């Protein structure tokens, strides 16, 4: 197997393990209490999220919500993995990293949705009474992966091709 494919699989695996481990710890230790980490800015608090990242689609009808969320997680994982396996020799290290972050995060949340019917979120950032929706390692991984991929495609790839 190609080095880039192995890197992709390794990073994806680490994200999945990190995500599921932190969610299990959150479920175990935060079930009945929140822990203030940085007063006025950051808490650890268990939130059961039936929606997508940052609570999106939480109010959608259950059947539609489940189909969209499970389907989108499967599609994201399959597309990112397929893209890496098909064009691995042409991918930059940053592209491999960004796609692995997206894939690993998608699989982590897919596990929760499939096995638990909802996702365990626990990272709560806020300023005063204004809270950002709670999220987890998978959500952060997907968001960072998408940002890196878009940034690479818009800014860095052009420079790489012209040099």
Curated annotation (Swiss-Prot):
It is an enzyme of class 3 (hydrolase). It catalyses: Release of signal peptides from bacterial membrane prolipoproteins. Hydrolyzes -Xaa-Yaa-Zaa-|-(S,diacylglyceryl)Cys-, in which Xaa is hydrophobic (preferably Leu), and Yaa (Ala or Ser) and Zaa (Gly or Ala) have small, neutral side chains. InterPro entries: Peptidase_A8. Pfam families: Peptidase_A8 (PF01252). It is found in: Cell inner membrane. GO terms for cellular component: plasma membrane. It comes from the Bacteria. Its main location: membrane. The chain crosses the membrane at residues 5-25, 37-57, 67-87, 91-111, 132-152. Keywords: Aspartyl protease, Cell inner membrane, Cell membrane, Hydrolase, Membrane, Protease, Transmembrane, Transmembrane helix. It is a multi-pass membrane protein. Belongs to the peptidase A8 family. NCBIfam families: lspA, PRK14779.1. This protein specifically catalyzes the removal of signal peptides from prolipoproteins. This is Lipoprotein signal peptidase. It comes from Sulfurihydrogenibium sp. (strain YO3AOP1). The gene is lspA.
């Amino acid at each position: 197997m190609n080095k880039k494919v192995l890197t992709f699989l390794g990073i994806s695996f680490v994200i999945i393990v990190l995500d599921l481990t932190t969610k299990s710890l959150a479920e175990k230790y935060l079930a009945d209490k929140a822990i203030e980490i940085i007063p006025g800015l950051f808490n650890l608090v268990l939130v059961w999220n039936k929606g997508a990242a940052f609570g999106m689609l939480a109010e959608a009808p259950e059947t539609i919500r489940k189909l969209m969320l499970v389907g989108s997680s499967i599609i994201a994982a399959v597309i990112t993995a397929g893209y890496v396996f098909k064009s691995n020799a042409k991918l930059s290290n940053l592209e491999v990293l960004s796609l692995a972050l997206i894939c690993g995060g998608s699989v982590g949340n897919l596990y929760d949705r499939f096995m638990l019917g909802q996702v365990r979120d626990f990272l709560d950032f806020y300023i005063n009474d204004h809270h950002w929706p709670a999220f987890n390692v998978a959500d952060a991984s997907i968001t960072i992966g998408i940002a890196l991929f878009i940034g690479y495609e818009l800014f860095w790839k052009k420079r790489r091709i012209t040099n």
